[in-house]
């Protein structure tokens, strides 16, 4: 949100520093799976489809299991899973690498990550988190770390 600067003249506008600080703080909360700044920086679905080695933007993980999700792209979608409609966008669809029972490239949604642990109890019920220490890197590097050819 822009506010008028000192003197109130239009050419002295600046960004609300509290809002920016709040947006930066959101990045440090691993339980916030898709903070505003990350959403803005996420490459749109299909934007890297012709890249040989796409950039991985975000990593999600099960804190008590072995499942990990690496998103290379993502876009808001409507209730039917479509991006290009005038309908209300109610979910976020990612494409990337999922490492669980066996590694695979495919689609997963923010809703799936949020509800993956429903019905579980105890430690197994700990929700999926976003790795706040993960830095964007090429998919080939992620595959190498997981010993995936």
Predicted segment positions?
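N-terminal domain-onset segments
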Residues: 1-63, 147-149
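Intrinsically disordered, low-complexity segments enriched in small/polar residues
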Residues: 3-6, 28, 79, 94, ...
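Intrinsic disorder/low-complexity signal
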Residues: 2, 12-17, 83-85, 90, ...
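Hydrophobic/aromatic-rich, well-ordered segments within soluble, folded domains that form packed cores
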Residues: 57-78
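Catalytic Cys-His active-site segments of thiol-dependent hydrolases/isopeptidases
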Residues: 80-102
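Short linear motifs in intrinsically disordered
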Residues: 40-50, 71-88
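Helix-rich interaction surfaces within compact, conserved domain-sized segments
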Residues: 96, 101-149
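Extracellular structured ligand-interaction cores
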Residues: 55, 66, 91-93
């Amino acid at each position: 949100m822009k506010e008028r600067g000192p003197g109130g003249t239009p050419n002295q506008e600046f960004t609300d520093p509290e809002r920016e600080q709040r947006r930066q703080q959101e990045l440090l909360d691993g339980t916030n799976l898709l903070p505003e700044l990350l959403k803005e920086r996420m490459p749109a679905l299909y934007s890297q489809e012709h890249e040989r080695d796409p950039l991985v933007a975000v990593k999600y993980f099960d804190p008590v299991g072995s499942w990990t999700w690496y998103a290379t792209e993502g876009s808001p979608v409507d209730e039917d899973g479509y991006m290009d409609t005038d309908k209300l966008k109610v979910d976020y669809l990612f494409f990337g690498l999922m490492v669980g029972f066996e590694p695979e490239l495919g689609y997963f949604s923010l809703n799936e990550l949020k509800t993956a642990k429903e019905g579980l109890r105890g430690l197994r019920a700990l929700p999926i988190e976003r790795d706040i220490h993960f830095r964007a890197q090429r998919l080939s590097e992620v595959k190498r770390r997981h010993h995936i050819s």
